[in-house]
From Swiss-Prot:
The keyword Ribonucleoprotein does not apply. The active site is at H446. Its main location: cytoplasm. The gene is pdhD. This is Dihydrolipoyl dehydrogenase. Binds 1 FAD per subunit. FAD binds at E39, K40, G41, N42, L43, G44, G45, V46, C47, K56, A119, D314, A322. The lineage of its organism: Bacteria, Bacillati, Bacillota, Bacilli, Bacillales. It comes from Staphylococcus aureus (strain Mu50 / ATCC 700699). Disulfide bonds join C47-C52.
Length: 468
């Protein structure tokens, strides 16, 4: 404590107000804690401000732009369709502002004290919060660290005017004529798709043998096919070597198949992963144990090696997903309350908003076989679903992974429009230990895309109606 600085007492202090932090603060407050949340930027964190939400707004606008140009088969003929990208950005910002304002209202409604500034730990029971004008010490009984992550900057690709990260891409004020994307993961693939829809000439440079490495090849094939139809060039096993800004753009040098090549573009978007924000918090001095790559070690209650300090979200091992952070947030808050809550990721989905959408939960077919499990894989195609046909969008499938012995659902994959929504039912089924018959006997509304989970389940038990 600094002389003259009177510390403020609080039960639980949360550092970071993203989808992990603000959820943790609200749940802790609901459980009777006096809660303070510290945020150095905007409430909502990366997800609401420069991540999940604005990227989906841009993607939605890009879909509408494409649909306006290509709906002749539906009898909708639009001539001279144009794009006002400034309006697109205004729409994106309006969505972000509504949600961030909503988060502030929820925090205040739950009597959470909101503090703006940067925090670092003084000891196991106090931290210092500083802004541009002042500093304040807070004493706490428990702390939850939810500081998220930031884009990785790779050698010779220093972020600037033309070399941008995902935040820069989301805030562009023009549609690039040419865009190079370094990294073919979900961020690069989603943003590459959006700008291709807006009219950019997109090249994706991926260092691995394939893009979207977190998904099965069977799932990514339709995505790659769709990208190529949009004119997106995908270069795999490509090593990005340097980016040199020019007067009007950027020159990217990369190596592929032993040959060095260059490509000129208006911008290069670097999406090669994210780094946890665990530095500059004073954690090393406290003796908090770290895992690999700057992540923090935690137990099943999200507790670090220091018993009253918890960590959630992108700063702990596992996929950097907003819904994972929110889930861990509730577990941490309930653990502080003395409950026996523990994390269990068995029903946690992962989604990618490409075209078509990708979603997976539990075991993939390959993972189950690698573990020596005796399984069945049962697929139902979008092309056999009435709702998909009426939407003129039949590219995709629903696949269930069940155990041969009792048809218990242990995994599911969905490719196609609405996959990100369909997967939730299948995650619930896995979480509840349901088998294929449980899903098959559940009456699903007709005509809906959700019926395909029932159809795939009927195939799993050997009695398919609308497929052979």
């Amino acid at each position: 404590m600094v002389v003259g600085d009177f510390p403020i007492e609080t039960d639980t202090i949360v550092i970071g107000a993203g989808p992990g932090g603000y959820v943790a603060a609200i749940r802790a407050a609901q459980l009777g804690q006096k809660v303070t949340i510290v945020e150095k930027g905007n409430l909502g964190g990366v997800c609401l401000n420069v991540g999940c939400i604005p990227s989906k707004a841009l993607l939605h606008a890009s879909h509408r732009f494409v649909e306006a140009q290509h709906s002749e088969n539906l009898g909708v003929i639009a001539e001279s369709v144009s794009l006002n990208f400034q309006k697109v950005q205004e729409f994106k910002s309006s969505v972000v502002n509504k949600l961030t304002g909503g988060v502030e209202g929820l925090l205040k409604g739950n009597k959470v004290n909101i503090v703006k500034g940067e925090a670092y730990f003084v000891d196991n029971n106090s931290l210092r919060v500083m802004d541009e004008k002042s500093a304040q010490t807070y004493n706490f009984k428990n702390a939850i660290i939810a500081t998220g992550s930031r884009p990785i900057e790779i050698p010779n690709f220093k972020f600037g005017k033309r070399v941008i990260d995902s935040t820069g891409a989301l805030n562009l004020q023009e549609v690039p004529g040419k865009l190079v994307v370094v990294g073919g993961g979900y961020i690069g693939s989603e943003l590459g798709t959006a700008f291709a829809n807006f009219g950019s000439e997109v090249t994706i440079l991926e260092g691995a043998k394939d893009i979207l490495g977190g998904f099965e090849k069977q799932m990514t094939q339709p995505v790659k096919k769709g990208m190529k139809e949009k004119g997106v060039e995908i270069v795999t096993e490509a090593m990005a070597k340097s980016a040199e800004e020019t007067d009007n753009g950027v020159k990217v040098t990369y190596e592929a198949k032993g040959e060095e090549k260059t490509i000129e573009a208006d911008y290069v978007l670097v999406t090669v992963g994210r780094r946890p924000n665990t530095d500059e918090l004073g954690l090393e001095e406290l003796g908090v144990k770290f895992a690999d790559r700057g992540l923090l070690e935690v137990d099943k209650q999200s507790r670090t090696s220091i018993s009253n300090i918890y960590a959630i979200g992108d700063i702990v091992p596992g996929l950097p997903l907003a819904h994972k952070a929110s889930y861990e947030a509730k577990v941490a808050a309930e653990a502080i309350d003395g409950q026996a809550a523990e994390v269990d990721y068995i029903g946690m989905p992962a989604v990618c908003f490409t075209e078509p959408e990708l979603a997976t939960v539990g075991y993939s077919e390959a993972q189950a076989k690698e573990e020596g499990l005796a399984i069945k894989a049962s697929k139902f195609p979008y092309a056999a679903n009435g709702r998909a046909l009426s939407l003129d969008d039949t590219n995709g499938f629903v696949k269930l992974i069940t155990l041969k012995e009792d048809d218990t659902l242990i995994g599911a994959q969905v490719v196609g429009t609405g996959a990100s929504d369909i997967i939730s039912e299948l995650g619930l089924a896995i979480e509840a230990g349901m088998n294929a018959e449980d899903i098959a006997l559940t009456i699903h509304a007709h005509p809906t895309l959700g019926e395909m989970t029932m159809e795939a389940a009927e195939k799993a038990i050997g009695y398919p109606i609308h497929t052979m």
